[in-house]
């Protein structure tokens, strides 16, 4: 069995890359989880139970990270020695900053007008932008452009926050 210190990719015997076969990840997760599930160690001693729990927790964390594209990209960059620094490094290219302001204004205007259709349209626009940026992120990671990939991750984190904010506004208006 792998070591608790192995990478998430090594744990599931998957290549350390952004593009990931979701069904292969799911299969690998189920295989590892079946081996380490604490129920298999119910009759074991306390030390073995504790180790099984550590493995189960580690397996779940690895799976949750790899199945989410943004977390997977952040993790890949971490493995490459790049700290995305989303909280400290908020500098973004001017065009993206302008786009951010437009999205925020659109949210404010639609929420003030109680216009759920406008919020839905904005959410669709954001999801389209997100898909395009994930494609770009994959290419950046594949080419080893790690600094640019870090910038792309920060932008995608922002897009996710804005999309969540739109969802909250839609929910508020629907109630």
UniProtKB/Swiss-Prot annotation:
GO terms classed as biological process: [2Fe-2S] cluster assembly; protein complex oligomerization; protein folding
Residues covered by the J domain: 7-79
GO cellular component, one term: iron-sulfur cluster transfer complex
InterPro entries: DnaJ_domain, HscB, HscB_C_sf, HscB_oligo_C, J_dom_sf
Family annotation (CDD domains): DnaJ
Keyword terms of this UniProt record: Chaperone
Sections of the chain in a coiled coil: none
Gene3D superfamilies according to UniProt: DnaJ domain, HscB, C-terminal domain
Database matches in Pfam families: HSCB_C
A GO molecular function held by the record: ATPase activator activity
Quaternary organization: Interacts with HscA and stimulates its ATPase activity.
PANTHER family documented for this protein: IRON-SULFUR CLUSTER CO-CHAPERONE PROTEIN HSCB (PTHR14021:SF15)
Family label: Belongs to the HscB family.
Role: Co-chaperone involved in the maturation of iron-sulfur cluster-containing proteins. Seems to help targeting proteins to be folded toward HscA.
Name under which the protein is recorded: Co-chaperone protein HscB homolog
UniProt organism field: Paraburkholderia phytofirmans (strain DSM 17436 / LMG 22146 / PsJN) (Burkholderia phytofirmans)
Gene for this chain: hscB
């Amino acid at each position: 069995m792998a070591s608790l210190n192995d990478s998430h990719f090594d744990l599931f015997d998957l290549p350390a890359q952004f593009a990931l076969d979701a069904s292969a990840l799911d299969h690998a997760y189920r295989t590892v989880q079946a081996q380490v599930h604490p129920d298999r160690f119910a009759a074991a001693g306390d030390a073995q139970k504790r180790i099984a729990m550590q493995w189960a927790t580690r397996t779940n964390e690895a799976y949750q990270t790899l199945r989410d594209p943004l977390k997977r990209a952040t993790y890949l960059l971490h493995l490459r020695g790049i700290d995305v620094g989303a909280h400290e490094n908020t500098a973004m290219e001017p065009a993206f900053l302008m786009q951010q302001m437009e999205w925020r204004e659109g949210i404010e205007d639609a929420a003030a007008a109680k216009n759920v259709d406008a919020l839905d349209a904005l959410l669709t626009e954001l999801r389209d932008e997100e898909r395009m940026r994930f494609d770009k992120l994959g290419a950046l990671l594949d080419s080893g452009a790690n600094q640019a990939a870090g910038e792309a991750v920060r932008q995608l984190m922002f897009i996710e926050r804005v999309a969540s904010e739109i969802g909250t506004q839609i929910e508020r208006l629907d109630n």
